[in-house]
Design a protein with these regions (language model features):
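Short, small-residue-biased leader/transition segments that mark boundaries at the very start
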Residues: 2-6
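Carbohydrate-interacting/catalytic domains
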Residues: 8, 17, 22-26, 32-38, ...
Length: 214
């Protein structure tokens, strides 16, 4: 997938073809209880937004519309009368705004310099972590918990000493969970609390090894 996004100016589509002809809507395909469906949809959207490649998401996803798209009728705007659906729309709005004002997430989409895996093979926890980077050296750490299980602490090994300032999470936009790395004998680590089905981005502020963190 990374080869395609670098070589072919890759697009990451969640298009109309995915929500018609008996496939169900995006949120309708999510397993679990009612609340879990919303959490997993937000998780998917944050995973899509963090990946290299340009994004395409079909209308209705931001409303968490349960019925399939039907060209004979309008979207179910009445869903916005319900708090969970209104919150989904607000989340998608904030995620889109965050993307447009954060060059780290798109400036080097067509370069190997814009992406670095941090955790790619943690099958035991089903957690992925990677860095996105821009040309000025700014970095964002992106983590994704694809399970209904809380992980705390979830230990991430980083290639540098840093403080991690939470940028956005799909769990609660008001809950801030900043993190500091620690230096152990074999490298630098951050212990992060991951809620069930959480996706979270952190601004990375690198510090010198051994420097006292404030």
């Amino acid at each position: 997938q990374r080869q395609m996004c670098i070589r072919d100016s890759y697009i990451l589509p969640l298009s109309h073809d995915e929500v018609v002809h008996g496939k169900k809507s995006l949120i309708g395909r999510m397993p679990g209880e009612y609340a879990d469906k919303f959490s997993q949809t937000r998780l998917l959207l944050m995973y899509q937004m963090a990946h290299p490649g340009k994004k395409l998401t079909f209308m209705g996803t931001e409303l968490a519309q349960f019925i399939e798209w039907n060209f004979r009728q309008s979207l179910d705007w009445l869903l916005l009368d319900y708090p969970t659906h209104e919150a989904m729309q607000q989340f998608v709005r904030e995620l889109n705004h965050f993307y447009t004002r954060t060059p780290v997430l798109y400036q080097l989409d067509d370069s190997w310099d814009g992406f670095e895996w941090i955790s790619v093979d943690d099958r035991a926890h089903s957690v992925l972590a990677f860095l996105r980077k821009d040309a000025e050296g700014n970095k964002i750490l992106c983590l994704f918990n694809f399970t209904p299980v809380e992980h705390y602490p979830y230990r991430v090994r980083l290639p540098f000493m840093a403080t991690l300032d939470q940028a956005i999470s799909n769990v609660d936009l008001r809950e801030i969970k900043d993190v500091e790395t620690v230096q152990l004998e074999d490298g630098y680590y951050a212990d992060i609390m991951l809620s069930p089905y959480e996706a979270v981005y952190y601004y990375v502020n690198e510090t010198e090894p051994g420097q006292q963190l404030q």
